């Protein structure tokens, strides 16, 4: 942003790790703030939050929606969204495809493709609530599907790989159609707007899940659009991200060699595909994947006393150098049966964790945790590169 830019108000950009915003107390009522939305680059913006029950206890979306309200200034209305796990128990064996369509023609064309490759057990519009703050919405639809066994046999693919390829094909080759969620017994809900409004728009108070993640977006290098809002998902993996990764091009070039297509104009998309590649394709554990994307410095590895751990970390850094994510970031990674929270190795973005009874809370700010659970205990900030992994009790989800 040029230093000469003037917006007609006395504006001072305060940059620090916790929040960035414009001071416009006196003139706010007289100024149309919509005219500058999206024009200001706030690299430490964005808000993330998550809650999970370790025993699989269901909760509505109200709590996670409320958690975003005290972090309102971290967003600018150009993207908000949620991921919820355990919300489709009656269709838990089917892939829930959440989709945006520009028009009926694009939906019809996409359905033709789906019918040729999947058994569609249910097709319906995703219920929404009309509110003034969410406008210009596309057609928002969902399908519960299972890959046709004859197609799997002819392609010699397992169903997860087949679904992932189908998602890539739709998102890159079918004009006006976009799959923004594709997992089993989970769903992503996102839009252009503030997250607390997006939650109301999608009626998330009527859904029940054992795990929720949320994101309020402040785009740094890309436009705000429905597909670009977080979370980003592939199969049951979802990512909400606060930060700006400087390794995007190197990461993207590497991951696209394995069939992934980065088309959504954001660095967060590549993190989702990296996690899918490391966990589903390479069969790494969550801790190992964390040690790849937020790898310790070589000097830190050399100082390790445990030789087994030292050799393992050296191996991961040597084999996957192009998947090291550099630059400031904090992420919450969702999957069926758990969550993982992770900071960059220098901890250049805030992230706080708290607990109460069977629940674990994660957020950019402690205030968000206190909204979800005023009596939260064991509040702490994980160290840079320290993975916080929470799993639901086996058989409880």
Q: What is the role of each PLM region?
A:
Residues 24, 32-397:
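Conserved short alpha-helical segments that host acidic/polar catalytic motifs at enzyme active sites
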């Amino acid at each position: 942003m040029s230093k000469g830019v003037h917006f007609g108000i006395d504006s001072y950009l305060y940059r620090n790790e916790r929040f960035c915003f414009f001071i416009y107390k006196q003139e706010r009522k007289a100024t149309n703030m919509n005219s500058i939305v999206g024009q200001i680059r706030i690299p430490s913006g964005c808000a993330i939050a998550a809650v999970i029950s370790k025993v699989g206890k269901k909760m509505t979306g109200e709590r996670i929606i409320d958690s975003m309200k005290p972090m309102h200034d971290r967003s600018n209305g150009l993207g908000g969204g949620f991921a919820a796990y355990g919300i489709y128990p009656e269709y838990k064996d089917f892939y829930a495809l959440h989709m945006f369509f520009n028009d009926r023609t694009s939906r019809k064309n996409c359905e033709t493709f789906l019918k040729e490759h999947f058994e569609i057990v249910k097709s319906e519009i995703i219920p929404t609530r009309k509110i003034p703050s969410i406008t210009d919405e596309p057609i928002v639809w969902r399908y519960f599907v299972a890959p046709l066994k004859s197609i799997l046999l002819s392609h010699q693919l397992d169903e997860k790989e087949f679904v992932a390829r189908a998602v890539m094909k739709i998102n890159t080759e079918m004009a006006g159609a976009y799959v923004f969620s594709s997992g089993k017994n989970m769903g992503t809900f996102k839009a252009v707007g503030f997250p607390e409004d997006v939650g109301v728009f999608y009626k998330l108070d009527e859904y029940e899940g054992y795990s929720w993640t949320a994101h309020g977006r402040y785009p740094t290098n890309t436009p705000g659009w429905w597909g670009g809002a977080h979370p980003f998902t592939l199969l049951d993996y979802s990512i909400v991200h606060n930060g700006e990764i400087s390794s995007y091009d190197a990461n993207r070039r590497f991951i696209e060699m394995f069939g992934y297509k980065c088309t959504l104009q954001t660095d967060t998309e590549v993190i989702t595909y990296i996690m899918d590649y490391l966990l589903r394709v390479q069969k790494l554990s969550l801790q190992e994947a964390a040690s790849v994307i937020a790898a310790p410095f070589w000097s830190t590895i050399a100082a390790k006393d445990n030789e087994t751990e030292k050799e393992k970390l050296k191996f991961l850094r040597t084999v996957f150098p192009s998947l090291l994510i550099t630059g400031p970031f904090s992420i919450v990674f969702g999957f069926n049966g758990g969550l993982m929270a992770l900071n960059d190795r220098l901890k250049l973005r805030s992230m706080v964790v708290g607990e109460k009874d069977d629940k674990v809370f994660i957020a950019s700010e402690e205030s968000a945790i206190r909204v979800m659970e005023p009596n939260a205990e064991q509040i702490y900030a994980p160290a840079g590169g320290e993975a916080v992994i929470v799993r639901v009790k086996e058989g409880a989800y």
